[in-house]
Amino acid sequence: MFPYLGIIIASIFGYLLGSVLWSVPITKWVKGVSIYEVGSNNPGATNTVRILGKRWGLAVALLDGFKVLITAAFAIGLSMIPNELFSKTSYFIPCIFVLIGHCWPIWFKFKGGKAVSCFLGLLIVVNYLYFLIFFIVWWIFAFKYRKVSLSSIIGTATILLLMWLPWTYGVMGYSLFNGYDSFIVAWDKHIVFSFYNLFHKFSSNIHGSNFADGMLTGQIVILIGMVILVVRHKSNIVKLKNKTEQPIYPKKEKNV
């Protein structure tokens, strides 16, 4: 039987949920404007900050990130179905479709955001250690330079360097598409950097598949997410190169 039906269903769910851009109805409801027509014209959390302020921007960022977590939870639910069609449902692969949906949403004529918040959600699902590192690096550079695009690019580059080390997953060796044997050793020692992957242990108890997403799957998913971020930040990269990128908040002038 085809054991990957769960991946297909969860990926479709992820794309459709990813296509929900919370910044659009929120800016319309709070200020009565279209986010596509004000600020940077981008329907993301950063532009929401410019239009509505930090609190609403944070709310949009959290809602966008939760789209990935909800999709992962949906995939977990499918993997618990005691049927071979769902026995090898990946929790990682469907999450990348949330980023695709966010950037090219079917509900908004394929005009989406830049998926930084969704990428953070992806890191939480694949390896929350990467999320913490990205988050720290992002805030350091955001505080110093006040440029979201620069902070996102540097944070992404940092994860790109670290993610090739098996120890960052809590395992001693590299695993390919099925990482169950590698991760079960780490889980038994209570080393769980890939927390969502742990739910494969419970699904295995239901149908005995002994399947878990491997490091390679996680790395491929993160790499695809990085490519999406670079593509969506192409104009920002040009502005950074030309030193014309505007800070999200200008530095306050010191009183003399």
Curated annotation (Swiss-Prot):
Transmembrane segments: 2-22, 58-78, 90-110, 123-143, 153-173, 211-231
Complexes and interactors: Probably interacts with PlsX.
Protein's recorded name: Glycerol-3-phosphate acyltransferase
GO molecular function terms listed in the Swiss-Prot or TrEMBL record: acyl-phosphate glycerol-3-phosphate acyltransferase activity
Pathway(s) it belongs to: Lipid metabolism; phospholipid metabolism
Gene: plsY
Location of this chain's protein in the cell: Cell membrane
PANTHER family tied to this protein: GLYCEROL-3-PHOSPHATE ACYLTRANSFERASE-RELATED, INNER MEMBRANE PROTEIN YGIH
